[in-house]
């Protein structure tokens, strides 16, 4: 009888300790992605795929080709080596606006406006056209741009609603 109690206590002790070891105290997975590019600079991960919040823009501000406030965005370049290539141009592409092929079209429930992209001097950048060359420095560099929503003109009806637009960028080093 005494032996049975000892055996029962031993089985319970080992059973409880194995349950404690089996408890999930956290787990996960780390996936590393990227690409190797033939360029004098690396593109910072936060610049490769970003979202620019345009905000809630009054339809009145867009009447007759009116513009929203510009929203700045950057393309950050890292570890640049300018020993051979010293400048970079940026080309933005995307679905062009039906009202103005130089601007980026919007999709969604909103309509009657388009996205304009500008360089750091507030000069409009036409879709599919390279910017003026920007001089690079060794190390890290920041390419500054801005975007604003622009009404499609006097004859356009600006319809309130949500919108999105996607622009791809390509860098070319000289």
From Swiss-Prot:
Residues 1-22 form the signal peptide. Keywords: Disulfide bond, Fimbrium, Signal. One of its GO terms (biological process) is cell adhesion involved in single-species biofilm formation. One of its GO terms (cellular component) is pilus. The keyword Heme does not apply. Belongs to the fimbrial protein family. It comes from Serratia marcescens. Its main location: other. Major structural component of mannose-resistant fimbriae of Serratia marcescens. Pfam families: Fimbrial. Disulfide bonds join 41-80. It is found in: Fimbrium. This is Fimbria A protein.
